[in-house]
Amino acid sequence: AMGDYLKALGDRDSWWFMFFYSVTFGGFLGLASTLPGYFHDQYGLNPVTAGYYTAACVFAGSLMRPLGGALADRIGGIRSLLMVYTLAAICIAAVGFHLTSAMAALGLFVVAMLSLGAGNGAVFQLVPQRFHKEIGVMTGLIGMAGGIGGFCLTAGLGAIKQSTGDYQLGLWLFASLGVLAWFGLHGVKRRWRTTWGSAAVTAARV
C-alpha cells in the first residue's frame, strides 16, 4: 500500500540506502549506456569495437554483483562499500584526464565497473539487516533509486558532452558523487554499527 512506502520514506536510513544504490547501480547503468559513444567519440573506435569494449565492462560489473555480496558477508557491507566508492571514484576521475590509450581507459572502466558491481551486492547485504519487516517495500524503493540514478547519469553525461564537446566534466562530476557517497557512508558508519548493525542485534557483518 502507498502508506507503507510513505512510512518507509519517513526513515532517513531509507534515503541513505537509495542514495548509495543510485551511485552504484545508477553508475553501472549510466556507464553501460554511455560507454559505446565514449569509446567512439574519444578514440575513434568503430561501433562494433566500441560495443565489445562496453560489453567487457558490463560483463565485469555483472559478474561482481554476487561476488560483492559474498565479500560483504565476509568483511562487512560498510567496509565493502567504502572500498567500492574509493576505487570507482579514482578510476573514473583518472579516465577524465584524456588518456591517450583506449586500452588504458578500458582497464580503468573495467575496474570501476567491477567496483560498482560489487557495490550493488554490498548494498543488498546491508538492507535486510536494517529493514527486516519492510524488506519488500525497501527493495522496490532502492531499486527505483538505482534506475533513476542510471537515467540521470546517462542524461547528464550526454548533456555535458553536448554543451562542452567533452566527457571530462561529466566524468569528474560522477567521480565526485562517489566521493560524496564515501563521506556519507563514513558519516553514518558509527551509528549503524552501534544500533541495528551491532553484534547484539545481528550475527551478520556490517
Model-assigned labels for residue ranges:
Residues 1-17, 202-206:
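Juxtamembrane intracellular "pre-TM" segments in multi-pass secondary transporters
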Residues 11-63:
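Extracytoplasmic gate region of multi-pass secondary transporters
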Residues 39-40, 71-72, 156-165:
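Interfacial helix-cap and linker-helix signal at transmembrane-aqueous boundaries
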Residues 175-206:
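Multi-pass alpha-helical transporter architecture, strongest
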Residues 64-76:
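Helix-to-loop junctions at the C-terminal end of transmembrane segments
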Residues 77-123:
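C-terminal transmembrane helical hairpin of 12-TM major facilitator-type secondary transporters
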Residues 126-136:
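Paired intracellular helix-loop junctions of major facilitator superfamily
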Residues 159-177:
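A membrane-interface helix-boundary motif in multi-pass transporters
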